[in-house]
From Swiss-Prot:
One of its GO terms (molecular function) is transcription coregulator activity. It comes from Aspergillus oryzae (strain ATCC 42149 / RIB 40). This is Mediator of RNA polymerase II transcription subunit 21. InterPro entries: Med7/Med21-like, Mediator_Med21. Component of the Mediator complex. One of its GO terms (biological process) is regulation of transcription by RNA polymerase II. Belongs to the Mediator complex subunit 21 family. One of its GO terms (cellular component) is mediator complex. Residues 63-83 have a biased composition (Low complexity). Component of the Mediator complex, a coactivator involved in the regulated transcription of nearly all RNA polymerase II-dependent genes. Mediator functions as a bridge to convey information from gene-specific regulatory proteins to the basal RNA polymerase II transcription machinery. Mediator is recruited to promoters by direct interactions with regulatory proteins and serves as a scaffold for the assembly of a functional preinitiation complex with RNA polymerase II and the general transcription factors. Residues 146-195 form a coiled coil. It is found in: Nucleus.
Length: 208
C-alpha cells in the first residue's frame, strides 16, 4: 500500500506539472484574438484590439487609431526594420551591422504565436497527455485496499485486524516464555554433563 501511495503522489505531482506546462503554452503561443461581441446587443462592450503579450498598456477599442493602442515603450520596442519601411533603406537594422530586420529582432519580445493548425495539434497532444495521467491516477486509486468498502465495513475490518494483532502478540509472548524455560533446562543439562565429565573440581582440589 505504501508503494501505491508513493506512485499516486508522484502522479499527482506530474499532473500538476503538466497543467502548469499546458497553461504556459496556451498563454505564450496563443494568437490573442479579440473577443467577438454578441450581435444586436447595444449594451455590449466594444471589441478590444489585439493585446501584445506582456503588454502593460490598457486595452483600446478595436476601432481606435493604431497610435492609441500601444504605449510609447511598446512603439519603441518594435523591430527596427519595420520602422524604416517608409524609407529607402527598408529592411536595414540600425546598429546591427547592416543586417536584416528579422536578424535584429528584439530578443525581449515574446515569441510569435503558432499557426492555427500547429496550435490545435499541440492542444490535442497536451489534452491527451493530461487524460492519460488522470487515468493512471484513477487506476492507482482503484487498487488501493478498501477503496470499495463502506465506512462501517472498514471499521469492522480494523477491529478484526486488531483482534488478530492481539492474538499474535499473545502467541509471541507465550513462545518467549517457553523459550526461557527451554534455555533454563538446557543450562541445567549442560551443567550436569560438565560435572559428569570433569567431576566436582572443588572436591578434587580439597582432597589434594
Amino acid at each position: 500500500m505504501a508503494d501505491i501511495l508513493t506512485q499516486l503522489q508522484t502522479c499527482l505531482d506530474q499532473l500538476a506539472t503538466q497543467f502548469y506546462a499546458t497553461i504556459g503554452y496556451l498563454v505564450t503561443y496563443h494568437d490573442n484574438s479579440p473577443a467577438i461581441p454578441p450581435q444586436n446587443d447595444p449594451t455590449a462592450a466594444p471589441a478590444l484590439a489585439k493585446i501584445t503579450k506582456n503588454s502593460t498598456a490598457p486595452p483600446a477599442p478595436a476601432g481606435a487609431p493604431a497610435g492609441s493602442q500601444a504605449s510609447p515603450q511598446q512603439q519603441s520596442a518594435q523591430i527596427p526594420g519595420q520602422q524604416q519601411q517608409g524609407g529607402g533603406d527598408a529592411g536595414q537594422t540600425p546598429g546591427a551591422g547592416g543586417g536584416t530586420g528579422g536578424a535584429g529582432a528584439d530578443p525581449n519580445l515574446p515569441p510569435a504565436p503558432d499557426s492555427p493548425r500547429t496550435f490545435a495539434s499541440r492542444q490535442r497532444e497536451l489534452a491527451r497527455d493530461l487524460v492519460i495521467k488522470e487515468q493512471q491516477i484513477e487506476y492507482l486509486i482503484s487498487v488501493l485496499p478498501g477503496i470499495d468498502s463502506s465506512e462501517a465495513e472498514q471499521e469492522r475490518r480494523i477491529k478484526e485486524l486488531e483482534k488478530e494483532l492481539r492474538s499474535a502478540e499473545e502467541d509471541r509472548e507465550q513462545r518467549v516464555r517457553e523459550l526461557r524455560k527451554l534455555r533454563k533446562k538446557l543450562e541445567n543439562v549442560l551443567g550436569a554433563v560438565e560435572v559428569g565429565i570433569y567431576g566436582d573440581r572443588g572436591a578434587v582440589a580439597s582432597r589434594r
